[in-house]
A protein has these predicted regions:
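C-terminal cap of thioredoxin/glutaredoxin-like
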Residues: 44-136
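Structural alpha/beta surface segment adjacent to cysteine/selenocysteine redox centers
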Residues: 1-49
Length: 136
């Protein structure tokens, strides 16, 4: 399933309280970022969710196995995400505000030096820009 559930009538996302996946998923992603494993988390988890190989990515051992590849423990992340939900939600809300401020929504969207990179087809360009910036 899509991590973000929409109302079929309005095509608007359901309120966060009614979302079965996006809350815990973004919280553990934020914890991975804080642990210095954000990109390592992003690759296997996004492949699991959108790669088309697993129908119910959120069930069973699929997610714990994907997260294991990052060197992090899925159960530990979930426990920490529950314990720190308010703090993590504040960070996620601030990130959403920043995303809106640059005129974008959805994922993946990243901004580097005021240049937005939206969509998976722009990640190679972002990577190149980051590499070039390191050379300066």
């Amino acid at each position: 399933p899509d991590p973000l559930v929409f109302d079929k009538q309005t095509m608007e996302p359901l309120p966060l309280a009614d979302q079965p996946h996006i809350g815990w998923l973004t919280r553990i992603a934020q914890l991975a970022v804080e642990a210095g494993a954000g990109m390592a988390f992003l690759d296997p988890v996004t492949r699991l969710i959108w790669g088309g190989m697993v129908e119910n990515w959120h069930e069973g051992e699929h997610m714990p196995r994907a997260v294991m590849d990052t060197g992090l423990d899925f159960n530990d992340l979930c426990a920490q995400a529950d314990a720190e939900a308010e703090r993590l939600d504040a960070i996620i809300d601030a990130n959403n505000d920043t995303l809106s401020a640059v005129g974008h929504w959805g994922v993946p969207c990243m901004v580097f030096e005021d240049e937005p990179f939206f969509g998976q087809d722009r990640m190679d360009l972002l990577s190149w820009r980051l590499d070039e910036a390191q050379k300066r």
